[in-house]
Amino acid sequence: MVGDDTYDMTDIWEIAFVDKATLGSTPQVTAPSVVKLLKQAPNMRIWAKLLDATGWGAKMMPDAKAEKAFAEKYKAYAGRYPNNTGTRTPFQAYRRQGFTLFAETDKVFNKEWGVPMPIYDEATQSITNWEAIKQVLNEQCGKIYSNLKPGDLTDKENAVNIFVATHLLNSNMQLANNSAVRHATEYGYTTGENINEPSTNYTVNVWDYYRTAWPQESKLLKITQTPDGQFYLNRFSKYDNGLKGTYVETGTLQEGILAHARNEVDGSVYNNVALYGSYHPIDNILSFNSDYASAMKSERVRMDFTTLLPEIASNNLRGKDAYFPTDYFSTLTNVSADTKIQLLYVRKGWVDYQGDELLVTGNYDFTLEVPAMPHYGTYELRIGYGVNTLRAKSLLTFICEDEAGNQDTWGEPLVLDQSDPVMASDGIAQKDADLNYDETLCAENDYALHKLGYMKPPAYFHIAGYTDSPARGELGRSYNGGNMRRVLTTSNMSPRMRYYIRFQSLNNASRAQLHLDFIEFVPRLVDVAGEPYREDVW
C-alpha cells in the first residue's frame, strides 16, 4: 500500500485483488474505500458520515500486512493442484478480506425517521447540520437497541454504533446472480445445458443467512432472492409447503426490505463497489426489532456451509473448486497441519443444497465457529451431507464461550459416521412414492426416523444438472440412500454466546472424506400434546 487508497501493483498479493491485464503497465492503482464511494454519492451523505463518526469506516479497511504476508507465504503454490486429496482442485494462494454494507438513502432516513436532510457544503465536503441529524438518529436508534453510552458514537454499547454494525457483513458480496445466494438445485429450477453457467429462469425463493458485524450479539441478516430477481433483506414468507406442494411463495409474514445491486440517482449510476467492499442502497430502515425477533422465533435457519466461511464470498469462490491452506479461514481455528480442505461445485447427478460442498480429508482436527441464534431458546442442530463408502468418521465436540471467554459444552460429544447408510440399511426409511404420498404415512415415517436422530433431506432441492423440470421422485427428500440429515445436538442457545464445533478424524484412511453441505438450526417448538413440532418437508 503506497498511500491511504493507493496500492502497489507490483506486489504479488495485489494481483488477487485487481485484474492487472485491465490496467496495462500501470504499477499503481487508486482504490477508493467504501467510505469515499459513499461520499461521492449525493444520496449517501448520512451513511458516509456515520461510518466516520462511529469508527466503522476504519474497521472496514483490510489488514494489508497480513494479506501480503499470506500471499508471500503461499505464492509458490499458485497454480498448483494438490494431488494427495483424492480430487484435483486448484490451490487458493491468495486471500482478500471484504465487507458489505446495506445503506438507507438520505431520503429513506428522512421519510421513515424524520431525520433532517443533510445540508452539504461542497467546499469543505462536510454536513453542516450534522448535530441535528445525530440527535434524531440517537433518539430513533435508542428505541430499538439499548443505549448505554448515548454520548459516544464509537462505543460498542452506543445505539447508533449498534445500528451501523448491524448493517455490515464481514464478507464482500454483490447483489448479483449467484453471489449473495446461489441457484443450483432448488425446486423446479433447471441450470440449462451448462451447469457452470446457470440459467436465470428462477422458480422459487432462494435465501441464506449472514451474521452481522455487531460483535456483542448475534443478529442474522436473511437475504432472499425472489423469482423475479429482486433481493430482499429479512423477508419472511408463507409457502405452498405441503407434501405435494411446489414451495411457491403464497404470501409474506414480513415483506422485507428491497435492496439494490447498484446506486442510481436521477439517471446517474454511482460506483458502489470498492476494492475490498461494497455498499447497496435499501428502500427502508433495516432494524432488528421486535418484529424481526418474533419472526426468528419460529424460523428454521438452513445455511450453506460455505456461508459460515466469510472468505468464500469475499474471494468470489462460490460455484468454484478450490483447495485451501489451513490458515485461510477466519472462522476455522486450531486447524491441524494435516487438515486438507476443499471446495467443490456440484456436478451433474450430484444432490447438493445450493450446489457447493466442502470436503475435508487427512488426519483432520479443526474447530468451526457457527452463528448463535438471535433469539434465546432451545434449538436442534443438524447437518446435511451425502453418504457413500468414501466418507469419513468424525468425533464432534460442542463448545460454547461467554463474553468473558469462559468455555463450556453445549451438547454431548457425538460420533458422526458419514459412510454408514443408516436410513437405507435399517429398513425404516421409506420413499414418499412408496407410501403413495400419503400425508399421514409419510409424517409417521419422518417421525420414526427423527427419533433415531436422522432425517431425509429437504424436498427443497433435487438432483443437479437436469435440463427439464425434475420429477418429484428426483427430489433430495425422495431419498435414494445418498443423502441425509443428522441431528447433532439439542441445546439452549443465547445470542450473546459464541458457539463452536470441533471435528476430529477417526479414520485410518487419509482420503476418507468429511462432507459438509448445509447446517440447520431449528427451534424446538412443542404443541399442547407434547409431541415434537412437525415442520414442513421442505
For each predicted feature, which ranges?
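Mature, structured domains of secreted/extracytosolic soluble proteins
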Residues: 1-538
